[in-house]
């Protein structure tokens, strides 16, 4: 790809548009991502190929995404990979797929675009753009870890006051009760 990204002509450049959510319960967020990705591709006149799926951001369960990156890396021409936001790429800075994509960018074969952040990561990206990408991945990882910590604290709190932290096991009844001052109902 060109050395500078200023006023670049992207017309008909192959673009892999990635809309991803972490699990099936978040699927309602996919249409909004898809719309933003398609609008971005239309604006730049990209030859966009939309991939939309639910798959965790953790490396063991990224079968679809790894396959897309493999296909993109074998693509014979330069290409762009577009994610709505950085955390749709990954929350793990050290993952193999991130390393692969960053190497493709270093070679000048790929660019990573994040339209919601106005970030285009390319071979000649300045230090502040590289840092924005890395910080976005770090903060995505932090967000995920913080949610996990909050869930653990909530479970500990429920157990400390004698509440079961979820539904009863199979074979037991889920009985709701209320506490009114000192009286159990």
Question: Model regions: which residues?
Answer:
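Coupling/hinge elements of helicase-like and P-loop NTPase modules
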Residues: 3-6, 145-184
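Charged, glycine/proline-rich intrinsically disordered loops and linkers
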Residues: 121-128, 177-185
């Amino acid at each position: 790809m060109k050395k500078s990204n200023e006023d670049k002509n992207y017309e008909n450049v192959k673009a892999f548009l990635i809309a991803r959510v972490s699990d099936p319960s978040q699927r309602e967020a996919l249409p909004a991502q898809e719309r933003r990705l398609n609008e971005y591709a239309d604006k730049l006149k990209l030859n966009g190929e939309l991939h939309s799926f639910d798959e965790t951001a953790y490396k063991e369960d990224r079968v679809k995404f790894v396959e897309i990156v493999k296909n993109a890396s074998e693509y014979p021409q330069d290409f762009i990979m577009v994610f709505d936001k950085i955390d749709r790429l990954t929350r793990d800075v050290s993952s193999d797929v991130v390393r692969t994509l960053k190497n493709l960018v270093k070679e000048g074969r790929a660019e990573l675009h994040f339209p919601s952040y106005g970030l285009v990561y390319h071979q000649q990206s300045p230090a502040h753009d590289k840092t924005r990408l890395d910080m976005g991945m770090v903060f995505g990882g932090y967000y995920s870890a913080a949610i996990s910590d909050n869930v653990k604290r909530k479970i500990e709190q429920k157990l400390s006051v004698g509440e079961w932290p979820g539904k009863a096991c199979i074979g037991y009844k889920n009985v709701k009760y209320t506490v009114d001052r000192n009286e159990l109902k």
